[in-house]
Amino acid sequence: MLRKYQSLIPIYTLLLLVACATAPESDVDTPEYHFKAGMRAIDNADYQQAIKSFQRSVDLDKKFALGYGGLGLAHAYLGQNGQAKDYASKCASRGSKDSEALALSGQIWITMRDSEKKWFKRASSHLKKALKRDEAHEGAMYWYGVAHLYNYQFDEAEDYFRKVVNKRGDYAGKADAKWKLAQKIVRAMPGTPAGKKMALKEKINRADLAVLFAEELKIGVLFDRMPVQNTDFQTPGQATQTANVTVPNDAINHWAETWIKDMIRYGIMDVEPDGNFYPDDTINRALYAMAVQRLLV
């Protein structure tokens, strides 16, 4: 009697799985379409909408690896690393034979690079597996190039971007832009880790600029080497250097306070009329040009 019912267990299991999945409401209510919608939301930085789209994709198909990867990517952008890592693992396990899913898992780890020490190792593991499955996979090559770029391995990054550009596929435009960025950084050759990190930022603020001037251009060393005038007369710049510097209120205990104080002391960057420095304000071209001009005078 028991054997008779044992043969029905797989059927009941299948029926249970089907019952747990959400039924589509239209022929175009598919996991693939919801995934594409989620990725467009990611591009628009609408991460909550992205989560809704990705969640719908896995509700429709519990085995849809890319949906879990999309959820991981959205949570990574939101700084919710625990959830992001869980979904990255689900994506890689459910899509272990799918280069696109493995590449997406790698992308999740790249997105968490500022807060996860082992991001490059984890991303590389997924991307290597993706390329092992398909050595010509465009997305995996592109993201491996991005991983090398953010790991300051510029030659390796350029190699991957070159291959992607030559394929002239969907990633060619993005790869070309990243390739040019890598070339610019190599030509500029930032000499410090801070310089390399700033070179990869799309925007920098006033605090970042203070650090760059101090560490990359060695402003303090340059001013210390300037000949001392044997006269009672001092230029405004020399007077600024010898005077005690009052740290603006909004720079006190700021992570860049030391560098901000130096730039004020040497007259390279100004305190605003209201007494604040505004260290977190984004630098525009005019402010940057003004600071550079003061260095040259």
Residue ranges, per PLM feature:
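Alpha-helical segment of the N-proximal tetratricopeptide repeat
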Residues: 26-63, 77, 114-115
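Conserved structural position within tetratricopeptide repeats
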Residues: 56-59, 90-93, 125-132, 166
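N-terminal propeptides
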Residues: 23-27, 81-83, 96, 100, ...
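C-terminal motif of bacterial Sec signal peptides marking the signal peptidase cleavage site
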Residues: 18-19
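Bacterial N-terminal signal peptides that target proteins for export
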Residues: 2-10
